Amino acid sequence: MCHSCFLIQQGRIADGMCRPKHPKFKLLKTPFKETDKLTYNRVYINQYLVGFGIGFYPDGRLMYFYSKDGYALKESDVENKKWENARNIGYWRTEGDKIKIEYFVCSQQGTYFREQGEIKSDSIVFYQTLFSPIKGKVVRETYYVLSDMSFE
């Protein structure tokens, strides 16, 4: 039996860009509020997986960056990137120092990733609550630090 025949593709990749077929960003239901806590049009780099980064626009949009070679994110991975040609896009919302992001990736037939965290000066910390049978509730922190890399 063909199990994959019943999977619904929610996203598509065209010209290196991943987009949802029918956008359903839940975060767009949250009213947008301007903030001065983020630095716009610059890349925040994941401190553990340095091949990943996030860039914020002042209007609530974001781009998620990946290293082309699988190693550290470089200027060449970011240059000439804008909303229209970014591999992955999403949205952000803030409430004080708290931030929520949501972005779409085409893996697993298309998935929306949602993260919550807080803005701390030139860094953003996202928290994920996990359960370990040995330790119980565990909170994993993922740090993104502001870099010198910029985009349009």
Give residue spans per PLM region.
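Lipid interaction determinants
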Residues: 5-89, 95, 100-152
